[in-house]
Amino acid sequence: MRVQPTLIERIIVAQNDDPQLMKIRNSVEAGVQSEFKIHEDGSLRFDNRICVPNDSALKHEILQEAHQTGYTVHLGGTKMYRDLKEIYWWNNMKREIAQFVAQCLVCQQVKAEHQRPTGLLQPLDIPVWKWEHITMDFVTGLPKTPSKNDAAWVIVDRLTKSAHFLPIRVGFTLERLAKLYMKEIVRLHGIPVTIVSDRDTRFVSQFWKSLHKALGTKLNFSTAFHPQTDGQSERTIQILEDMLRTCILDMKSSWDEHLPLIEFAYNNSYQASIGMTPYEALYGRRCRSPIHWDDVGERRILGPELVQQAVEKI
């Protein structure tokens, strides 16, 4: 059994009702038009991007799916355009995406809430490998959920910008945070070499000791830390906080149940600071989602080629 969305099929059918696209198709079939191609599935494509007809309902469905579903969580206009332009093409696409996002009431509310000046930030050295140098911060003041969570712990890899969101309570002890870090982060990425945090130095030092206690090691380790995040890390934290707060406006008191999808949405969306999605930097390609179903399916990279491409991208 092959699972695939019906959206592409509906776009192909609707292309036949669009006069402009039919004119282009006729030119392609006559060998006149070179920028456009007819794909093996019968769709008209521009640079391998499927051409979306001038159908307001169809375009609205695509924009809605790319902006405010559980796995996208109100991405900004630039991120939406970067993501969608890899798969879809239509006239004035960038402008229509910007207009769609500008009209989103949830986005307007969140953007207005976090306007605040930032201090002087010191640049940090670029890491040489994934998840060895991390940034951590806490998003507090969140509504208490039925599970009693009222904060989110944000942990970001400074190289790939990939991140994890962990629901917590403000009153969690350092020992409990260390055990949670070991359970959710160490098992996937190992132990960090440096920790960047806006928290005071005592917090980082005590957290480091608690982490090694949770690991059960008797070896003595030391780690570097920075008392203030760099510009890129602070921006990443702000993006994640915005996504959290939009989710809260949509999901209300059950926001912690949606954290896995918020995490996925962030990691699978374009980040200007690295020129790709965090998943691409981490794994070599973006992960499959309903809106990127066919895009991922057409790229089959395995073994050494996948590793090499991931290394080249970062």
Predicted regions and their residues:
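Integrase module of LTR retroelements
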Residues: 1-314
